[in-house]
Amino acid sequence: MTGLSSPGDALLRFEPLTEGVLLKRYKRFLADVELSSGETVTAHCANTGPMTGVLIPGQRVRLRYAPSPKRKLAWTWEQAEVPGADGQHCWVGINTALPNRLIRATVEAGCLEAQLGAIARIRAEVAYGTNKRSRIDLLLTPAEQNPDQRPIYLEVKNTTWTDGSTALFPDTVTERGQKHLIELMGVLPDARAVLVPCLSRPDVTAFAPGDSADPRYGELFRQATNSGVEVLPCCFSFSADAVHWQGTRLVDLG
C-alpha cells in the first residue's frame, strides 16, 4: 500500500463534473437536471433509496457525462449541494456505486493503517456467509508485519442522512443491511469484521445507527459491536474533480 494521506488530500480524481439544477427525481433511477446552458437532460440516479435530507428539487447538482453504446443514459448524477450542519452548504456524494471504490482507495493510500495495520492484498466481492451466498465488499489480507494476521472483512455503507452533525445509516428499513450485520458477526473470531460507513459529506463529526428508520438494524448494530464487529466511519468531501479524505469519525451509540 502507498504512503499515508492527510485530511484534505485527494484520494480520487476525475474529469470535472458538469453543474446544473435538479428539476425532479422520478422512477427511482431517473433525474431531470437543467444545465447552465439551459438544456434539460435526464441523468441516471444510482441511489434508489429515499435520499432523506439530500433530495431537494431546485438544488445544485453535479453530473458525469460518459456516453456509451452500453448505456441508455449518457449522464450520471454524482453530487448534490445541501445545507450543512455548520450552516454552510456542502456537496454530498450520492452515487452509491462510488463508496466501495472510495474505501478501497482509502485503504490503498494507507489512511487506515493505524486501525487496520499494514495490508498486503485487497480483494473485492468475495463470497462468504451462509452457503457463501453473500459477497463481502472488500476482503483484506494483512501484511507480514501486521501483528494481527486474521483476514479482515470490510462491509461498506454509503451514508448521506444526518441529524445535526451526526451521520445516520440506514435511512429506511434495510433487510439486506440487517443480514450483512449478522454475517459479519459470523466471521468472528477467526477473522476481523469491520463495518465502514462511508460518510459522503464533510460536515459530520460522528456516526450512529438510524434507529428511527430501522429499529431492528439499530438492535443488530449494537449486538454486532458488542460481539466484536468494529465500526470505522470514514469521512470525505467532494469537489467538481475529486474526492478528498477528511479522516475517521466517532461512533455514537446513544
Swiss-Prot record:
InterPro entries membership: SfsA, SfsA_C, SfsA_N
GO molecular function: DNA binding
A Pfam match: SfsA
PANTHER family tied to this protein: SUGAR FERMENTATION STIMULATION PROTEIN A (PTHR30545:SF2)
Family: Belongs to the SfsA family.
Protein name: Sugar fermentation stimulation protein homolog
Originating organism: Synechococcus sp. (strain CC9605)
Lineage: Bacteria, Bacillati, Cyanobacteriota, Cyanophyceae, Synechococcales
Designated gene of the protein: sfsA
